[in-house]
């Protein structure tokens, strides 16, 4: 009989440790207040920093506290084109410039925004990773709703009062450059999660994996496996509807 395979050991579970010790903090929009709902408030970009474990850079923006005589520093996801010393305007009456924070209802159709709120006041949930953005498709003023296109291509209807940052998240094209070295992959995953290196099933012995063994590396049987298979067999393409490359052009309904 074979050994307990990797995904069976995973299923038993253990306490997950997320590698967040070096992170610079949560990147969120300002808490929604009177100044943003009715006018605008001005901040200045103090510095742009790298956040370990995140592809996009962060911007430290200092705003004057509307209620106390002090400065409040916020951490935003930096958009492409944002620079230190730049003024950032946040609010309903802010201008339509890169880096400014506006409610979606105040942006014309076709505007490219990022770090968009899913629910009003949640401080940013959609289009937050490097190079990503959300496109405003249309507004419905009667219901105070806005239709947006997400980075996945999916369309979503959200409140027109939900805020977004004008522009594209910085760090685009990051995944186009290959890592090339194991050392770079090591440092990448060291600040993410313990999911690397990952030994291929065909490189194992037959006791360790259903794809293991043989005088050359080959699976030796169909790699698809049924949903009802016992856990020791569940390796490969589980309950696959189809396999192989998609051929021809694909039409997506608008």
Curated annotation (Swiss-Prot):
It comes from the Eukaryota. GO terms for biological process: cytoplasmic translation. Coiled coil: none annotated. Its main location: cytoplasm. Keywords: Cytoplasm, Ribonucleoprotein, Ribosomal protein. It is found in: Cytoplasm. The keyword ATP-binding does not apply. Pfam families: Ribosomal_L2, Ribosomal_L2_C. Disulfide bonds: none annotated. One of its GO terms (cellular component) is cytosolic large ribosomal subunit. One of its GO terms (molecular function) is structural constituent of ribosome. SUPFAM superfamilies: Nucleic acid-binding proteins, Translation proteins SH3-like domain. InterPro entries: NA-bd_OB-fold (IPR012340), Rib_uL2_dom2 (IPR014722), Ribosomal_uL2 (IPR002171), Ribosomal_uL2_C (IPR022669), Ribosomal_uL2_CS (IPR022671), Ribosomal_uL2_dom3 (IPR014726), Ribosomal_uL2_RNA-bd_dom (IPR022666), Translation_prot_SH3-like_sf (IPR008991). The keyword Oxidoreductase does not apply. Component of the ribosome, a large ribonucleoprotein complex responsible for the synthesis of proteins in the cell. The small ribosomal subunit (SSU) binds messenger RNAs (mRNAs) and translates the encoded message by selecting cognate aminoacyl-transfer RNA (tRNA) molecules. The large subunit (LSU) contains the ribosomal catalytic site termed the peptidyl transferase center (PTC), which catalyzes the formation of peptide bonds, thereby polymerizing the amino acids delivered by tRNAs into a polypeptide chain. Component of the large ribosomal subunit. Mature ribosomes consist of a small (40S) and a large (60S) subunit. The 40S subunit contains about 32 different proteins and 1 molecule of RNA (18S). The 60S subunit contains 45 different proteins and 3 molecules of RNA (25S, 5.8S and 5S). Belongs to the universal ribosomal protein uL2 family. This is Large ribosomal subunit protein uL2. The lineage of its organism: Eukaryota, Fungi, Dikarya, Ascomycota, Saccharomycotina.
